[in-house]
Structure formats: C-alpha cells, structure tokens
Amino acid sequence: MAKDHSPPSSEGAGATDKKLEERIGTEGLDLPVYDNEVRTEEQTYAFDDSRKIGITGAGFLILNKMIGTGIFSTPSGIFAATGSVGVSLMLWVIGGLLTFCGLSVFLEFGLAIPRSGGEKNYLERVYRSPKYLATSVFLSQMVLLGFSSGNSLAFGRYVLFASGRDIADGWQARGIAIACITFAVLLHGLLPKWGIRLFNVLGVFKVFILLFIVCSGFAALAGHRRIPDPHNFDNAFRLEVGDGYGGGGAYAYATALLRIIYSYKGWENANYVLGEVKNPRKTLSLAAPIAVGGTTILYVLANVAYFAAIPKAELAKSEVIVAGIFFRNVFGDSAGARALPVFVALSNLGNVLAVSFAHARVNQELAKEGLLPYSKFWASNWPYNAPLASLFLHWIVTVIVLIAPPAGPAYNFIVDLYTYPGAWINGFVVAGLIYIQFKKSENWTSPWHTYLPISILYLLANIFLAIVPFIPPTGGSNQDGYPYYVFPIVGVGVLLLGGVYWALWTKVWPKIGGYRIVADRHVLDNGEEVIRYRKVKVGHSE
C-alpha cells in the first residue's frame, strides 16, 4: 500500500496536537468513511514491559499455534489420502521443509518491518498499486477465514472421547467448541496477562504430550501395545487402496499437503504481534527457528508412533481422534487411558488461545488504519487495555463456521477451508519478496536474507496448493461428505470478495458520503502509539 508521508493537517488540532507533531513522526493514511460517527479524536495504545513478549513468550506463542489440533488429528486424513505409510511420512518431512522456506521469507519481511500485522505489512510494502487492493484482499481472508473453528471442534471431540462418547462432529462437540472459544476470548479480553501466562504453561505442557506420544510409539515398536502388530512398516512405500484410504490421485495429495501445512501453521504467529514483542528483531530471529525446528522433529516422530500402534483401516477412519485411538491401542481401555485424551484437549485449548491472541491483533491492526467498518470500535482497547472488540470479531466468525456445516464430519472441511486461501496469500508474499530483492529501485534491505532457490521452492509449493484442489479427485467427486470443489471455490470467493470490498470502500462509499477519514498514526518516544481520526471532504485539500 502506498502511504502518504506528508505531515497531517493541523486543521481542527489544538496546541496538544502541535506539541505531539513536534515530538513524533507521522504517517498519514487517507481512508474512506463508512458512517457519520467519526470526529477528530485520538486513541492511544501503550503496553508496559510486563505485557510485552520476550524470546520465551514468542517461542511459546509459535509452539502453541503449531502444536494444536493438527498433529493429534490430521494424520488420519493424510494417510487416507495417500494410502502409503512411507509417502505419508515423506509428506510430513516435506511440510517441515516448506515451513522453513516460509519462515525464511517471513523473517526477511518481519525483521525489516517489525510491526504487528504479518502479511498485511508485507503485501502493502510490495503491492502499492492499485492503492489498498492487496490490503483489502488480505483483510477479507483474515477476517472471514481467520477462525479458530477447527481447533475448538477438536477440543470438543477429545472431551467427548475422554468421557467415553465417541461422537462425530455433531452438535454436542460443536457446543463444547463454542464454550472453548468463548473462554479464550473472555480470558484474553478481560484478563490479558493471565491469557499470556496460560498459553505459556500450555505450551510447555503440549511439548511434553508430544514427547510422551513419541516415547510411547517407541514402546509400541518394541511390542508394548494392547493390539497385534499392525505391520504398517512392511513395504512402507507401497501405494495401497484399502478400506477408506488410497486412490485419490493428485487432488488427494494436494489436500494431504494442505492438511500438513495446517498442522505446521503457527510458525508465522509471532509476526502478527511484533508490536507487542520486546526487541522484535532479536526475539523473532531466535525464537522462530528454534520453535519450528523442534516442532518438525516431534511431528515426524509422532507420526511414526501412530503407525506403530494403529492399523491402517482404523487410522484412516479415526478422523479427529487419532491420538485418542493411539492411547487406547497402547494403554488399553482403562479409566486412566481414557483420561489421556483430556491432555490432548488441553493442548487444543492452548492452540485456541494462541490463535485468538494473534488473529485479534491482526484484526485490530486493520481497524487501527480505518480499514474496517466502524474501525474505532474494532480498534478499541477498552476496558482492560486489550483488544476485546477484535477478539469478539474473531469469536463471531469462529462460531458461524462451527454451526454452519450440516451435522456430520466437519473437521477436515474446516481445516481445508482455513488453510487453502493462505496458499494464495503466501504465494503473493513470496513473489513480492523475489520482486523487491531484484528490483534495485525498491532499495530493499533486511537483517535476514532469503536465497532465491528457497523463495522459488516456496512459491511453486503454494502454486501447487492453490491450483490442484480444483482438479477432480479419482474415485468420486465428494470428499468427507462435501463436493471436492467447495473449499477452493469458497476460498477464492472470499479473496475476490476482498476486491469487491476494495471497490466499494475506495470508490463508492466516499462518493455517497461525500467525505473520507484520515487516520494519522503516531509513535511517541516512549513507545506509545496514537491514532487520530479526522474527517476530510472528498476533493478537499488537507
């Protein structure tokens, strides 16, 4: 997004504004208006050091989003899509490599632009014309599809499984899911310090859960399990078509990789909240690679553990509760074994806390610049210096996605819908990085450098993930009870909706209203951020 760096007008500003402008640099953002509420006024955003995130907190913020429902739930869909133990494991390794490629791209952008907002800032830096178009597309994807529905639903399924009721994605599981996201939103909005403390604790906890699964898997390989040896590693790379798995073709491999990417999602989480990170350049460059590297190793070993204890047909049909089936097959059906899925549910809760924390900050960043209708409300930090309004927006979308699908299997569909548009956004981000690296007039510099082969590999992977889901799968047009084309069409539709929103926002509404809003963002010497909103008539010189 091209930004006007001329000083804001002093029209309507008093002595306080003049003193403010003497102390700070300003960044004027000419924005259309949506309603008649906004007057010349200011909002201030300030966080003391106790609220800022250090290296440990940033690492756990990444871990909490990465280690969530994915590794405990998606291995079922991965194997069902490929029909091969060896290929499934290779896809998990490939997913880890692609994650490191994406991390490198985001480190280069994030260390050069250490502000909250993630991809919003990177797209704005590259795609400056038409003005605001890239931002509007990202806004549509982040607000409408940046939900915590899959994580919350998995929490509900594991709670029910632990209680002895193995129920599909029906209304009981969805009701518990709504309670889960409601708790997360209220905690972050009303007790923000405790929200950070809890997801730090759960970050440690879920690492131990994964380590416990890995160690239990080695025990299962040694013969310590309650079922006969499933022999899953015999001729591991054979492509099979069995009861509920294999034979899906290129479409199946694309959706399998999408679900693996979903499981690795979270490596970019700290980029969303860099404005609340201590010494962001140092913190991000240390916390992100350590968290991603450790998680990748644990993911591959956890999948080996699952294959050591779960027969192929049972794994393919286990859907969300893969880890629950694993515990039952290794430890039996005792009350103690049934309690183990509760620990996975708590891990899922940590993921919901991390996702809602980060996505609410992105929503708030969009609102701070006047990009949302009624932006002043969504940007508010009332009442406890936390983005309760933006958290509420995240809650609304999450609940809608939870209750919208018909009763029955919904988890895989929600995962695909959440992950797919990100392939387009990430593709544009990495393509933009390649462009500004080689366009000398861009004067691009960053403390981190991503080499061209890494960028090209990441770009090609995202093109594959964006295009192949439109190819009909082998053996039928329905996947998990939904037509195969639903999630890619909905995903692309949401991105196109961002273009429609851009046209309304930049062209239609200013003409109808006759004026626009100018949002001037200021950063004080003490780190406080002040945003002043002013009405400006269309065609009026500032």
Predicted feature residues:
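Membrane-interface loop-to-helix entry segments
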Residues: 173-233, 265, 288-292, 415-426, ...
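Membrane-helix boundary/coupling elements in multi-pass transport proteins
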Residues: 115, 139-153, 264-277, 335-374, ...
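TM-loop-TM module centered on a large, flexible mid-protein loop between adjacent transmembrane helices
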Residues: 118-130, 161, 240, 292-353, ...
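Transmembrane helix-boundary motif of multi-pass solute transporters/channels
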Residues: 39-40, 45, 49-154, 261, ...
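Helix-loop-helix junctions that connect adjacent transmembrane segments
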Residues: 12, 20, 25, 46-49, ...
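Membrane-interface "cap" regions at the ends of multi-pass membrane proteins
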Residues: 1-82, 99, 510-542
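Hydrophobic transmembrane alpha-helices that form the core helical bundles
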Residues: 100-181, 185-186, 348-362, 410, ...
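C-terminal membrane-solvent junction of multi-pass transporters and transport-like membrane proteins
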Residues: 376-388, 426-492, 512
